[in-house]
Amino acid sequence: MKTLHLLRHAKSAWDEPGLPDRERGLNKRGERDAPRMGEALSRRMAPMAVVASPARRAQLTLEGLCRGWPALGECDHTVDEGLYTFSADDLFRWLLDRDDRQQSLFIIGHNPALTDLANALAEDDGLANLPTAGYLQLALQIDHWRDMRQGCAQIEFSLFPRQL
Protein backbone atom coordinates (compact mmCIF):
# COMPACT_ATOMS: atom_id res chain seq x y z
CA MET A 1 0.00 0.00 0.00
CA LYS A 2 1.19 3.54 -0.83
CA THR A 3 0.35 6.84 0.84
CA LEU A 4 0.03 10.12 -1.01
CA HIS A 5 0.11 13.43 0.86
CA LEU A 6 -1.19 16.37 -1.17
CA LEU A 7 -0.86 19.99 -0.11
CA ARG A 8 -2.02 22.90 -2.21
CA HIS A 9 0.22 25.97 -1.98
CA ALA A 10 -0.94 28.66 0.43
CA LYS A 11 -2.94 31.69 -0.76
CA SER A 12 -0.96 33.54 -3.40
CA ALA A 13 -0.55 37.24 -4.03
CA TRP A 14 -2.03 38.91 -7.10
CA ASP A 15 -0.90 42.46 -6.31
CA GLU A 16 1.82 42.74 -8.97
CA PRO A 17 0.26 42.92 -12.44
CA GLY A 18 2.51 41.50 -15.12
CA LEU A 19 4.45 39.28 -12.73
CA PRO A 20 4.92 35.82 -14.31
CA ASP A 21 2.72 33.16 -12.70
CA ARG A 22 5.72 31.17 -11.44
CA GLU A 23 7.02 34.21 -9.57
CA ARG A 24 3.92 35.06 -7.54
CA GLY A 25 4.49 34.93 -3.80
CA LEU A 26 2.05 34.57 -0.92
CA ASN A 27 -0.38 37.12 0.42
CA LYS A 28 -0.81 37.80 4.15
CA ARG A 29 -3.30 34.97 4.58
CA GLY A 30 -0.93 32.54 2.84
CA GLU A 31 1.97 33.67 5.01
CA ARG A 32 -0.19 33.06 8.10
CA ASP A 33 -1.72 29.72 7.01
CA ALA A 34 1.44 27.83 5.98
CA PRO A 35 3.10 27.79 9.44
CA ARG A 36 -0.23 27.02 11.12
CA MET A 37 -0.70 24.03 8.82
CA GLY A 38 2.87 22.91 9.53
CA GLU A 39 2.27 23.04 13.27
CA ALA A 40 -1.03 21.15 12.97
CA LEU A 41 0.45 18.46 10.72
CA SER A 42 3.42 18.02 13.08
CA ARG A 43 1.00 16.78 15.74
CA ARG A 44 -0.33 14.10 13.40
CA MET A 45 2.59 12.68 11.42
CA ALA A 46 6.33 12.18 11.26
CA PRO A 47 8.34 14.59 9.12
CA MET A 48 9.24 13.42 5.63
CA ALA A 49 10.85 14.74 2.48
CA VAL A 50 8.58 16.97 0.42
CA VAL A 51 8.63 17.35 -3.36
CA ALA A 52 7.42 20.79 -4.36
CA SER A 53 6.55 22.69 -7.49
CA PRO A 54 9.20 25.20 -8.57
CA ALA A 55 6.64 28.03 -8.38
CA ARG A 56 7.66 30.64 -5.82
CA ARG A 57 4.34 30.32 -3.95
CA ALA A 58 4.93 26.56 -3.51
CA GLN A 59 8.47 27.16 -2.26
CA LEU A 60 7.25 29.80 0.19
CA THR A 61 4.53 27.42 1.36
CA LEU A 62 7.17 24.79 2.12
CA GLU A 63 9.24 27.36 4.01
CA GLY A 64 6.17 28.30 6.04
CA LEU A 65 5.36 24.66 6.80
CA CYS A 66 8.91 24.25 8.11
CA ARG A 67 8.59 27.32 10.35
CA GLY A 68 5.56 25.75 11.98
CA TRP A 69 7.07 22.26 11.93
CA PRO A 70 10.83 22.64 12.58
CA ALA A 71 11.55 18.89 12.23
CA LEU A 72 10.22 19.05 8.67
CA GLY A 73 12.93 21.60 7.90
CA GLU A 74 15.57 18.97 8.67
CA CYS A 75 14.39 16.69 5.84
CA ASP A 76 15.83 16.76 2.32
CA HIS A 77 13.24 18.43 0.13
CA THR A 78 13.31 18.58 -3.64
CA VAL A 79 11.85 20.76 -6.35
CA ASP A 80 10.46 19.02 -9.41
CA GLU A 81 9.47 20.80 -12.60
CA GLY A 82 6.81 18.14 -13.20
CA LEU A 83 4.78 19.53 -10.30
CA TYR A 84 4.34 22.92 -11.94
CA THR A 85 1.15 21.79 -13.63
CA PHE A 86 -2.54 22.52 -13.39
CA SER A 87 -3.46 19.23 -15.08
CA ALA A 88 -4.42 16.12 -13.13
CA ASP A 89 -3.38 14.01 -16.13
CA ASP A 90 0.15 15.44 -16.02
CA LEU A 91 0.33 14.90 -12.27
CA PHE A 92 -0.99 11.34 -12.66
CA ARG A 93 1.73 10.55 -15.24
CA TRP A 94 4.36 12.08 -12.95
CA LEU A 95 3.25 9.82 -10.08
CA LEU A 96 3.35 6.69 -12.26
CA ASP A 97 7.12 7.16 -12.64
CA ARG A 98 7.94 7.35 -8.92
CA ASP A 99 10.40 4.94 -7.34
CA ASP A 100 8.61 2.05 -5.61
CA ARG A 101 11.02 2.27 -2.67
CA GLN A 102 9.03 5.35 -1.71
CA GLN A 103 6.03 4.11 0.23
CA SER A 104 4.85 7.66 0.89
CA LEU A 105 5.04 10.83 -1.19
CA PHE A 106 4.33 14.35 0.04
CA ILE A 107 3.85 16.89 -2.73
CA ILE A 108 3.08 20.60 -2.82
CA GLY A 109 1.34 21.64 -6.00
CA HIS A 110 -1.47 23.50 -7.67
CA ASN A 111 -5.16 23.41 -8.41
CA PRO A 112 -7.11 22.28 -10.30
CA ALA A 113 -4.60 19.42 -10.66
CA LEU A 114 -4.65 18.41 -6.98
CA THR A 115 -8.44 18.49 -6.57
CA ASP A 116 -8.99 16.66 -9.85
CA LEU A 117 -6.35 14.05 -9.00
CA ALA A 118 -7.85 13.43 -5.55
CA ASN A 119 -11.30 13.02 -7.08
CA ALA A 120 -10.01 10.60 -9.71
CA LEU A 121 -8.09 8.47 -7.21
CA ALA A 122 -10.72 8.57 -4.45
CA GLU A 123 -13.88 8.60 -6.55
CA ASP A 124 -16.25 7.92 -3.67
CA ASP A 125 -15.04 10.80 -1.52
CA GLY A 126 -16.12 13.68 -3.82
CA LEU A 127 -13.96 16.64 -2.85
CA ALA A 128 -15.44 19.88 -4.24
CA ASN A 129 -12.23 21.90 -3.93
CA LEU A 130 -8.91 21.58 -2.13
CA PRO A 131 -8.52 25.06 -0.62
CA THR A 132 -5.24 26.94 -0.52
CA ALA A 133 -2.91 25.40 2.09
CA GLY A 134 -5.34 22.46 2.28
CA TYR A 135 -3.95 18.99 2.95
CA LEU A 136 -5.15 15.50 2.01
CA GLN A 137 -3.75 12.10 2.94
CA LEU A 138 -4.75 9.36 0.51
CA ALA A 139 -4.32 5.63 1.08
CA LEU A 140 -3.69 3.96 -2.29
CA GLN A 141 -4.50 0.27 -2.61
CA ILE A 142 -1.42 -0.41 -4.74
CA ASP A 143 2.07 -1.82 -4.24
CA HIS A 144 3.65 -0.07 -7.24
CA TRP A 145 3.17 3.54 -8.31
CA ARG A 146 2.85 2.39 -11.93
CA ASP A 147 -0.32 0.48 -10.91
CA MET A 148 -2.11 3.63 -9.84
CA ARG A 149 -5.55 3.93 -11.42
CA GLN A 150 -8.84 5.72 -11.01
CA GLY A 151 -10.65 4.71 -7.83
CA CYS A 152 -7.62 3.07 -6.16
CA ALA A 153 -7.58 5.35 -3.11
CA GLN A 154 -9.49 6.64 -0.14
CA ILE A 155 -9.04 9.96 1.60
CA GLU A 156 -7.84 8.99 5.08
CA PHE A 157 -7.45 12.47 6.49
CA SER A 158 -7.95 16.07 5.46
CA LEU A 159 -7.01 19.33 7.11
CA PHE A 160 -7.86 22.83 5.90
CA PRO A 161 -6.73 26.17 7.35
CA ARG A 162 -10.29 27.15 8.27
CA GLN A 163 -10.36 24.18 10.67
CA LEU A 164 -7.48 25.59 12.73
Give the role of each language-model region:
Residues K2-E81, L127-A128:
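Active-site-proximal alpha-helix that buttresses catalytic centers in soluble enzyme cores
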Residues G18, A118-A122, R149:
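Short, flexible helix/strand-to-coil boundary loops that buttress conserved ligand/catalytic motifs
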Residues A58-Q59, A88, L114-T115:
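Short, well-ordered alpha-helical microsegments
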Residues T61-L65, L91, L117-A118:
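Hydrophobic packing residues within well-ordered alpha-helices of enzyme cores
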Residues G82-L95:
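Short alpha-helix plus adjacent loop in nuclease-associated cores
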Residues R98-F106, N111-G134, I142:
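Non-DNA-binding regulatory cores of transcription-related proteins
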Residues D124-E156, P161:
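Domain-level recognition of soluble alpha/beta enzyme cores
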